[in-house]
Amino acid sequence: MKDFVVITFYKFFDFPDYKERQQPIFNFADEQKIIGTILLAHEGINATIAGTQTALDAMVNFLHQDPRLADLTYKVSTAPKQPFKRLKVKLKQEIVTLGQPNVDPNNTVGTYIDPKDWNDLIQNPDVTLVDTRNDYEVGIGTFKGAINPNTKSFREFPDYVAENLDPQKNAKVAMFCTGGIRCEKATSYLLNQGFQEVYHLKGGILKYLEEIPVAESLWEGECFVFDERVTVKHGLETGHYELCYACGHPIDAEDKTSAAYEIGVSCPYCIEALTPERRSRFEAKWQQRQQMKACQAS
């Protein structure tokens, strides 16, 4: 069986008619049997979708017909199994939620650094390297020497900056995220706060893993992605993690050897929150899931 093709893309632009575009975009994607998530907001578009190469080419061509999206670019990877359950085209306040209405990457954004130049930048001792992703993502993999802000959501990032970074002490700041979109806002926010030299990895971790050979890489671990693959590694090959059915935290083979792991019920990251009521609920849901799989297979 051929792998599923996955593309990711985003663009910040003035999109006042985003609500009117929701149904046409959904209809076209649905006709092409595309699955995944497309987010629309006044500030732009953000998507990760999967399908056949022909269908995805048609989708991109459809979006390119809008002059505002004529220069839309995308990243391509593959998945060994269907990476999404359905198609969703959702209306949002932001295409990536920072909660800072004055931040506009269309007006102010950091300096883009290509993957081939990233290693030189982050090995500079004068550069403060910050991972803008959430704590559970950082725990799976990050760049050597990167700071983990220990955030549970991107909304907490401004608080981290206020408490830990200083424009005078941190003269050069480099940031990175999965595909680049969070850094668009993160770098814009830092520049608004008075930081002078702010850089971000163009195309994000995914582009780096796609282009940089393992022998030259400063990346350690795997990269969490928001689909059924869970993680990817160099070359964008599907990684070794899966999600705990109970709490949704990424788990690996070592986690599954823990006494805290019970399939469908708990893992080392949620065992402390497990109550008798939650156990009963998760056990029932797991049994229902297995019954549905058995029915689909018969």
Curated annotation (Swiss-Prot):
Its EC number is 1.14.-.-. Transmembrane segments: none annotated. InterPro entries: Rhodanese-like_dom, Rhodanese-like_dom_sf, TrhO, TRHO_N. It holds the Pfam family UPF0176_N. It catalyses: uridine(34) in tRNA + AH2 + O2 = 5-hydroxyuridine(34) in tRNA + A + H2O. Keywords: Oxidoreductase, tRNA processing. Residues 123-217 form the Rhodanese domain. One of its GO terms (biological process) is tRNA modification. One of its GO terms (molecular function) is oxidoreductase activity, acting on paired donors, with incorporation or reduction of molecular oxygen. The keyword Oxidoreductase applies. The active site is at C177 (cysteine persulfide intermediate). Belongs to the TrhO family. PANTHER family: RHODANESE-LIKE DOMAIN-CONTAINING PROTEIN 7-RELATED (PTHR43268:SF3), THIOSULFATE SULFURTRANSFERASE/RHODANESE-LIKE DOMAIN-CONTAINING PROTEIN 2 (PTHR43268). NCBIfam families: PRK00142.1-4. HAMAP family: TrhO (MF_00469). Catalyzes oxygen-dependent 5-hydroxyuridine (ho5U) modification at position 34 in tRNAs. This is tRNA uridine(34) hydroxylase. It comes from Picosynechococcus sp. (strain ATCC 27264 / PCC 7002 / PR-6).
